[in-house]
Amino acid sequence: MTAHFDRSEFTCKCGCDKSDISPDLVNKLEQIYAYFARTPTGCKAIVITSGIRCSTYSPKVGGYSNDAHTKGIAADIVVYKADGTRYVAEQIAAVAEKCGFSGIGLMNGACHVDIRNKNNYVNAHWFGDERTGNNSITSFLGYLPPLATSQSVTASKHTLTVNFDGKTIFEKEF
């Protein structure tokens, strides 16, 4: 699907195999990955804890039968730093806002992101905290992690290495 995401990560967890996720959502998730990769703590992976859901399964896990997950325009994500620890939900939300996500919700240990708009969803914009029920957050940008001050990318015939602030944050052998 993309460099950091596979279609199977987005498939409905009930076993129905529904997996018609929006390519625009996946592209925006790649933007989140790219932003975190440029921070001093890097990005090891973004894990999709919930992608598309069928209308039967979504209410069973706290959603609705016609929510953004059922439309293929939402994902619940956890972002891991290069050292394997997690970014906090507020940092993920801040980066998602910077990347243009229009639906963002803080969750315990994860962050809901979606690409709702007036054509595909009842309310075109929503920032909230699902932990507290506060559905009127105006911005998360105060939690935006800083970018690295130096970066380099090197490639040999068989290895791609990305360094930020002197630390290797990504390495892939081909």
Say what each PLM segment does.
Residues 49-76:
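Short, surface-exposed glycine/acidic/tryptophan-bearing loops
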Residues 16-20, 74-81:
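The substrate-binding groove and active-site-proximal loops of carbohydrate-active enzymes
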Residues 173-174:
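N-terminal accessory interaction module
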Residues 1-45:
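Active-site acidic/histidine clusters and adjacent loop/turn architecture
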Residues 40-51, 101-108:
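Surface-exposed patches in mature extracellular/periplasmic domains of secreted proteins
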Residues 46, 75, 111:
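A broad, low-specificity signal marking well-ordered, structured residues that form hydrophobic/aromatic
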Residues 66, 71, 79-165, 170:
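Catalytic cores and adjacent binding grooves of peptidoglycan-active enzymes
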